[in-house]
């Protein structure tokens, strides 16, 4: 099923397997190239399974055949109570129920491997379609219809004029913040194999003869290894190891593709002048990270860890810049006679000689009469010295390095070597401007209660323990600020200046952080510069946000930062906890209202606001297409800046493939620009006012319905019984515990990710839709709801996301999970609300079944459903057997471990099939 995180266009093809056994009717609609690749992958997988165990292959084919038939029965509606013989889902249940635990583990692996291959083929096809579209674009066209960013910029020019459009372009900023939230159920070893299989599949299309035969052999080897590799990691990653996620994405995509984003925009705006004149596109991509710095509820993230991760990031980007500087420099072989160096460049060379004659003599020896090359080679050596912390040669800041690059660029331009000035050298400048010497801006986060407790401890026992020993957590809090300061000293203020307070309740929470920052240092000059960011997460906090901000700007440290930054201020909004706290409908509307009120408040105080969106990948955590989310924001809340969290499976889906990474960044940048277009601002303002009464009524009814469910006596233990919540907590997919610290005792303490993840695994997706059906039923005005869907971007995006979530639910499977709990009253509430919500969503969008008019996405979900069903059946049977036999004390420790491992295998497989976790 196509990931919830990506906007689906006709370029995004559905996936289906074919081969021996029953075929789904949708296969006839598959593009030939996609079908061919899927045929190849399934053929190889079946051969791999046969080589491993013929009985396993036979069982795989048998389950697959009945699962496909069961899916046809579900979608065609031929299954009725009077025709039970055609219930092929029950046949799947009967087959799987007779398989022993060990063989069930292998069967789960087989289907999980299939999903990895299916996802890969889908991704490859999307890339090929994008390439085909771009190849078909006429160079004479005013804009590139495939490049959303150029389309958005031209719309701004048409509506506002070239000058104002350029002003907005220069203000453009996209801040993705990569987090270690444990929502990627694939282990890294699996990701590496998937990447290699992707490369082999691409090569397979181009090769022939013996080369193709060798490529096929390697493809067999990789798919065989993928099947034989446990989908479950051997241990949880450490926070330092989690940083490798960013390093992988940096190496494989970001470092090289982000300059391509800038270059593609320049190519269409400047036309034939691109690469011959100074660039138009600013370096607007500013990545951040919580990995190694988010300590909210994660005791594994310490001050020592933060220092290690910061050093890891810095050394890695410096190494990449060194390699690129040397590569670009070696190609600047222009002689002084043809390309005379400028006086400014000669001055830089003399400065380098004063710094180290050894380096300049070495460079001059290599590059006689090639001063541009010689200067660049010394710059590369200085980057190496920066990694080694050589005080005599190192760069003090990235700004100094960029200044040297621009000196070389100006010299080349003055010598009329413009292609050299604005070619690869400009790409290098963009890389330095984007990633700096820090790679990502580390953002620290901690719970507000931790700060208040630390201050209470200090007041009781004294800063240095004069009246008794301080608590270990207090020492850690103070060490955190010292770590932040040391990172700033090494890599610059930009490397780590943001400190986020989760569960911000009052301005006092802000004061606490500034006070602790001061107390951590003996000398005032050592106190680091920080921007404290309130994070409003729960419904009540969102409603009180403006009052808190009003008090916050009275704090002297905040006033000083506002003055120093020209009025810049950042506020974070939490989509996850607000959804678990209030339900999806109320959370969506409360967040929109809070953004609107905060934007108006900021404007009244002349504050340059950035709203930071703490969105997850799943719809229940604010997920969905990022570009549509931007366009639905209230007026004044974006201002050409968009910042959001990116995590887990979202990082891999959006940035794992270079072509798709470019598309994603361009798409978000386009929406961020368009949000300032007068036509978009007017539409959002007018529609928000027009449908305010409707929104208020939906909010109240949905909220009451959601709370009625959560407040039902015994809900929390029932929830953990009818979902694999406990088992998900055992998955080694992140260093962070599934529950918050501070004494987690209830559903309130449960993190939102396992809340979402568990409902998705049970094929219910309750967190994405519960309460909306009742709200629509009580509102009753279908015409108004339909009109709002057509006119109001916020509502249409919300309804479309819910329709997609409903399409991934399966009432037949859901009933099997709900049967694990002995609560008919709760079962009825969930199933009744699911049916009611589906009925109203279909009425609103005008569909007879979910995603009827979103053919590509609907087909993708429908085609993948049978294989997810097979894994879901395996999972729910294992859960039922495990819990029943544990209660009766019938299992040995080893048997219990085998059942648990089977469940974890199915969790990984279902996540791969659904392509979302939390």
Where on the chain are the PLM-derived regions?
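Conserved alpha/beta core surface patches that mediate binding of polyanionic ligands
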Residues: 269-287, 479, 510-515, 547-559, ...
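Active-site cores of enzymes that catalyze phosphoryl transfer or operate on phosphate-rich substrates
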Residues: 367, 373-375, 385, 417, ...
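Often metal-dependent polyanion-binding catalytic scaffolds in large enzymes
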Residues: 2-462, 473, 530, 623, ...
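Active-site-proximal structural scaffolding
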Residues: 38, 56, 104, 243, ...
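Ligand-binding clefts of soluble mixed alpha/beta catalytic domains
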Residues: 571, 603, 645-781
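Catalytic or ion-translocation cores adjacent to nucleophile or general acid/base/metal-coordination motifs
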Residues: 15, 301-332, 520-700
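C-terminal accessory/interaction regions of large nucleic acid-associated machines
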Residues: 720-918
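Short glycine-rich or small-residue beta-strand-to-loop segments that form or flank ligand, phosphate
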Residues: 112, 408-411, 498-502, 532-535, ...
């Amino acid at each position: 099923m196509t990931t919830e995180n990506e906007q689906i266009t006709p370029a995004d093809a559905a996936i289906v397997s074919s081969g021996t056994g029953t075929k789904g009717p949708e296969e006839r609609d598959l593009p030939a190239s996609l079908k061919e690749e899927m045929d190849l992958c399934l053929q190889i997988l079946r051969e791999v399974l046969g080589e491993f165990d013929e009985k396993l292959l036979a069982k795989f084919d048998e389950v697959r055949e009945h699962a496909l038939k069961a899916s046809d029965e579900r979608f065609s509606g031929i299954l009725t109570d009077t025709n039970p013989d055609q219930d092929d889902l029950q046949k799947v249940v009967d087959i799987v129920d007779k398989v022993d635990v060990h063989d069930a583990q292998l069967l789960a692996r087989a289907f999980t491997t299939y999903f990895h291959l299916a996802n890969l083929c889908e991704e490859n096809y999307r890339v090929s379609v994008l390439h085909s579209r771009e190849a078909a674009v006429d160079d004479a066209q005013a804009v590139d219809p495939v490049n959303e960013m150029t389309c958005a910029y031209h719309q701004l020019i048409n509506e506002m004029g070239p000058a104002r459009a350029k002003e907005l372009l220069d203000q453009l900023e996209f801040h993705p913040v990569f987090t270690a939230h444990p929502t990627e159920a694939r282990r890294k070893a699996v990701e590496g194999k998937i990447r290699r299989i992707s490369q082999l599949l691409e090569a397979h299309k181009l090769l022939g003869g013996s080369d193709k035969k060798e490529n096929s052999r390697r493809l067999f080897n990789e798919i065989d290894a993928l099947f034989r590799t446990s989908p479950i990691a051997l241990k949880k990653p450490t926070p330092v190891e989690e940083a490798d996620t960013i390093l992988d994405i940096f190496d494989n995509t970001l470092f090289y593709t982000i300059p391509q984003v800038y270059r593609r925009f320049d190519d269409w705006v400047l036309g034939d002048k691109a690469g011959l004149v100074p660039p138009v596109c600013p370096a607007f991509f500013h990545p951040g990270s919580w990995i190694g710095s988010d300590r909210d509820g994660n005791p594994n993230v310490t001050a020592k860890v933060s220092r290690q991760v910061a050093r890891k990031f810095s050394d890695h980007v410096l190494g990449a810049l060194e390699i690129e500087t040397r590569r670009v420099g070696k190609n600047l072989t222009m002689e002084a006679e043809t390309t005379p160096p400028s006086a400014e460049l000669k001055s830089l060379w003399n400065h380098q000689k004063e710094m180290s004659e050894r380096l300049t003599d070495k460079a001059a020896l290599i590059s006689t009469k090639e001063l541009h090359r010689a200067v660049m080679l010394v710059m590369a050596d200085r980057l190496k010295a920066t990694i080694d912390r050589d005080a005599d040669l190192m760069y003090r800041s990235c700004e100094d390095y960029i200044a040297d690059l621009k000196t070389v660029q100006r010299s080349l331009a003055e010598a009329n070597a413009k292609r050299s000035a604005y070619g690869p050298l400009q790409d290098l400048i963009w890389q330095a401007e984007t990633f700096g010497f820090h790679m990502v801006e580390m953002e620290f986060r901690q719970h507000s209660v931790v700060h208040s407790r630390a201050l209470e401890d200090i007041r009781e026992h004294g800063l240095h323990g004069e009246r008794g020993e301080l608590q270990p957590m207090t020492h850690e809090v103070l060490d955190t600020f010292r770590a932040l300061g040391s990172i700033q000293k090494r890599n610059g203020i930009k490397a780590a200046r943001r400190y986020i307070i989760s569960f911000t309740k009052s301005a006092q929470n802000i004061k606490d952080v500034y006070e602790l920052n001061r107390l951590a240092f003996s000398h005032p000059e050592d106190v680091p510069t920080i921007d404290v960011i309130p994070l409003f997460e729960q419904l009540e906090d969102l409603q009180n946000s403006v009052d808190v901000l009003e008090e916050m700007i009275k704090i002297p440290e905040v006033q000083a930062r506002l003055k120093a930054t020209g009025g810049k201020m950042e506020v974070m909004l939490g989509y996850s906890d607000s959804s678990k706290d209030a339900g999806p409908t109320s959370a969506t509307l409360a967040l929109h209202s809070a953004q609107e009120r905060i934007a108006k408040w900021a404007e009244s105080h002349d504050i340059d606001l950035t709203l930071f969106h703490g969105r997850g990948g799943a719809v229940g955590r604010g997920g969905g297409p990022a570009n549509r989310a931007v366009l639905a924001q209230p007026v004044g809340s974006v201002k050409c800046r968009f910042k959001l969290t990116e995590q887990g499976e979202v990082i891999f889906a959006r940035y794992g493939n270079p072509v798709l990474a470019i598309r994603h960044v361009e798409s978000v940048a386009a929406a961020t620009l368009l949000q300032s277009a007068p036509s978009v601002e007017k539409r959002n303002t007018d529609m928000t006012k027009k449908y305010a009464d409707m929104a208020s009524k939906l909010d109240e009814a949905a909220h009451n319905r959601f709370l009625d469910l959560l407040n039902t006596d015994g809900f929390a233990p029932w929830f953990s019984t009818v979902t694999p919540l406990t088992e998900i907590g055992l998955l080694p997919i992140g260093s962070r515990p599934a529950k918050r610290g501070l004494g987690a005792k209830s559903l309130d303490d449960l993190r939102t990710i396992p809340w979402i993840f568990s409902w998705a695994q049970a094929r219910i997706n309750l967190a994405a839709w519960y309460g909306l059906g009742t709200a629509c039923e009580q509102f009753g005005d279908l015409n108004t709801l339909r009109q709002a869907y057509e006119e109001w971007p916020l509502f249409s995006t919300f309804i479309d996301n819910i329709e997609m979530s409903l399409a991934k639910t399966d009432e037949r499977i859901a009933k099997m999970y709900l049967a694990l709990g002995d609560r008919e009253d709760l079962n009825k509430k969930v199933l009744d609300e699911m049916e009611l919500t589906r009925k109203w969503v279909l009425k609103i969008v005008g569909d007879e079944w979910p995603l009827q008019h979103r053919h590509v996405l609907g087909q993708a979900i429908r085609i993948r459903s049978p294989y997810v069903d097979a894994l879901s059946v395996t999972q729910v049977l294992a859960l039922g057997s495990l819990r029943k036999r544990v209660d009766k004390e019938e299992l040995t420790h080893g048997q219990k471990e085998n059942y648990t491992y089977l469940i974890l295998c199915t969790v990984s497989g279902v996540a791969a099939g659904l392509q979302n976790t939390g």
